[in-house]
């Protein structure tokens, strides 16, 4: 079993050494490392070149990708990869010892291995994120592992054309939803062998909140139509509608017309009523039940503005 590691790099001079060291810890299962610099303006390239010089036993190649964004950087070497598996790894994240080998052993013929991970905040506090057992619901609620904690079968990634470089946010769940829709199989593990480190700034893919929430909500609506709506499990459908509703509430702040359109085309036809446990304000629930979503959100926006003044 062989694995290629793909690391997009953008202004990570303080992180990439430790990241590459964590890849080296994986041992012989890694047969190739691809570092892809994505327009770094710091000393990232020099640090990588120095690491290559100091680790002649590692099969590593440094590419440069001028198209901005993590998706373009991750796609750069895909056509060259002949390993059975791909480990995508952000340059500020870490793999703990045996992460990859344990996932290969536990893959059981699946196409995507999704796993728990440690999320380390900027204050160094850590929490463990455990993924959903239900794959479809995990995609809906953004809880199906992480780009770096998961392991991806190369042929599955190539068959769907890799990462969507037009997707400015929600990239990993766009990828996961396409893989699921294509009929690929998923295996859940709970090894927790990846550390995802938060950074205040400097990540490759960042954008404005309006676009982020438009992408997030549209992706879930599309997945609901293609997959969830066809399921017979009413609890999964209800949970998915609740997720879409929560997304529209945030989206309403940035794009009220789109939020209302999604309500009218998805939530209303399914006779959706917000669960009491998801709404803090009884007044909102009362307004919603009597006057509907549009008026309830408009009133909530007015009240929020009054509180902030």
Please annotate each region the language model reported.
Residues 2-4, 22, 32, 174:
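Cell-envelope/extracellular polymer assembly enzymes that use nucleotide-activated donors
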Residues 57, 67-70, 78, 99-156, ...:
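Flexible acidic/His/Gly-enriched loops in nucleotide-sugar-dependent glycosyltransferase catalytic domains
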Residues 14-17, 42-51, 94, 98:
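Acidic helix N-cap motif at the loop->helix transition within catalytic regions
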Residues 22, 37-46, 67, 90:
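A conserved acidic beta->alpha catalytic loop
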Residues 195-309:
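C-terminal subregions of glycosyltransferases and related glycan-biosynthesis enzymes
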Residues 132-216:
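Conserved nucleotide-sugar donor-binding catalytic segment
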Residues 86:
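Short aromatic/hydrophobic "clamp" motif used to bind/position activated sugar donors
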Residues 12-25:
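Short, well-formed alpha-helical segments that are part of the catalytic scaffolds
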């Amino acid at each position: 079993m062989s694995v290629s590691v793909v690391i997009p790099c953008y202004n990570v001079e303080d992180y990439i050494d430790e990241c590459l060291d964590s890849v080296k810890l994986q041992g012989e299962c890694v047969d190739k490392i691809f570092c892809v610099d994505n327009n770094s303006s710091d000393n990232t390239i020099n640090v990588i070149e120095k690491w290559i010089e100091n680790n002649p036993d590692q099969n590593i190649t440094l590419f440069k990708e001028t198209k901005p964004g993590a998706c373009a950087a991750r796609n750069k070497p895909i056509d060259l990869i002949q390993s059975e598996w791909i480990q995508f790894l952000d340059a500020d994240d870490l793999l703990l010892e045996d992460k990859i080998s344990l996932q290969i052993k536990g893959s059981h013929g699946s196409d995507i291995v999704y796993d728990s991970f440690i999320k380390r905040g900027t204050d160094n506090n850590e929490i463990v994120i455990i993924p959903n057992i239900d794959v479809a619901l995990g995609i809906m609620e953004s809880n199906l592992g992480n780009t770096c904690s998961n392991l991806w079968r190369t042929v599955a990634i190539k068959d769907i054309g890799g990462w969507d470089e037009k997707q400015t946010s929600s990239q990993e769940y766009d990828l996961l939803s396409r893989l699921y829709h294509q009929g690929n199989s998923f295996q859940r593990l709970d090894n927790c062998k990846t550390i995802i480190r938060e950074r205040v700034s400097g990540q490759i893919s960042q954008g404005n909140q309006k676009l982020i929430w438009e992408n997030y909500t549209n992706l879930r609506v599309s997945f609901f139509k293609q997959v969830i709506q066809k399921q017979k499990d009413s609890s999964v459908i209800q949970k998915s509608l609740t997720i879409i509703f929560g997304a529209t509430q945030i989206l309403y702040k940035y794009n009220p017309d789109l939020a209302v359109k999604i309500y009218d085309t998805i939530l209303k036809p399914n006779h959706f009523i917000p669960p009491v446990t998801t709404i803090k304000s009884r007044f909102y629930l009362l307004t919603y039940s009597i006057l509907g979503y549009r008026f309830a959100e408009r009133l909530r926006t007015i009240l929020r503005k009054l509180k902030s003044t």
